[in-house]
A protein has these predicted regions:
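Membrane-embedded transmembrane alpha-helical bundles that form the catalytic cores
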Residues: 6-265
Length: 265
């Protein structure tokens, strides 16, 4: 089908390649990352969350300026609903607030992902691409609200920390989705460890090599094969399918390694 062929010709749509500050981009590697870490390591511990959130929002706004308000709205509404679900509130009130949060978060997700599908035949909607990372920060928000509702964790009083949980740039665009109660201790207090920084740099470099040396090389092969369907043979079709599968694997694996490395650093 034409859609499948388009994806095979450009599978990078799955891995955030439209973002000007993608982890493998020149802008990220030589401008954003060095400047961010210099500031982050030099400032006092009490200000690190401020810099980390500001850097994460800048990272997202650089790539998605038109959708930054949606991310900020998700952070604010999630924080307010969590605060309202305090332990002394009645079970019915807590349940109602959870349902309200689920409707809000999933409603936003459905609106931006499927509005064109449902209403495009009736009204002329502007053609906007999907906000990068919307699924990930939406489900992170839901994870937080569910944890508060189940009393696995108290409501987060600090808006900065909750914003950091939803918008932390290493996991903002491609995940992974980490339950709030697992990440909560690190939001409150972290220590910089030389071994963590070293291991993080190594893991990031491995991921970058997977992306730049393997995935991108395979992308050229796949594009060449699926870009000329008229001369496609059984052998070249199989080669294209295998190359495409390997490209996706190294794209996702490389991105995951880079995200883990950034987190360690």
């Amino acid at each position: 089908p034409p859609g499948a062929v388009k994806i095979m010709q450009d599978p990078s749509i799955f891995v955030g390649e439209g973002l000007p500050v993608a982890f493998s981009s020149i802008s990220f590697l030589f401008y954003f990352l060095p400047l961010f870490f210099i500031i982050y390591y030099l400032i006092p511990a009490r200000a690190k969350n401020v810099v980390l959130l500001a850097g994460s929002l800048f990272f997202y706004a650089w790539g998605e300026p038109r959708w930054i308000l949606l991310l900020l709205a998700s952070i604010l509404v999630t924080w307010l609903l969590g605060r309202a679900m305090r332990p002394e509130a009645s079970a019915g009130r807590r349940r109602g607030l959870l349902i309200l949060g689920l409707v809000f978060q999933l409603g936003l997700l459905v609106a931006v992902k499927y509005a064109g599908f449902f209403f495009g035949a009736f009204i002329d909607l502007p053609k906007l691409h999907l906000p990068l990372g919307v699924s990930f920060y939406t489900f992170h928000a839901i994870s937080y609200l569910v944890d508060v509702y189940r009393q696995k964790t108290p409501p987060q009083k600090n808006l900065l920390r909750l914003g950091l949980y939803l918008a932390l740039f290493p996991k903002l665009v491609m995940g992974p989705i980490v339950p709030y109660h697992e990440l909560e201790p690190a939001l409150a207090q972290r220590t910089i460890d030389a071994q963590d920084v070293s291991d993080g740099c190594f893991r990031f470099t491995i991921g970058l090599a997977k992306k730049a040396l393997l995935a991108d090389a395979l992308a050229g092969l796949v594009t060449g094969i699926w870009g000329d369907l008229a001369s496609l043979t059984v052998l070249s079709a199989w080669l294209g399918l295998i190359g495409y599968a390997l490209q996706l694997y190294f794209d996702f694996s490389g991105y995951s390694d880079m995200a883990i490395g950034l987190g360690r650093m």
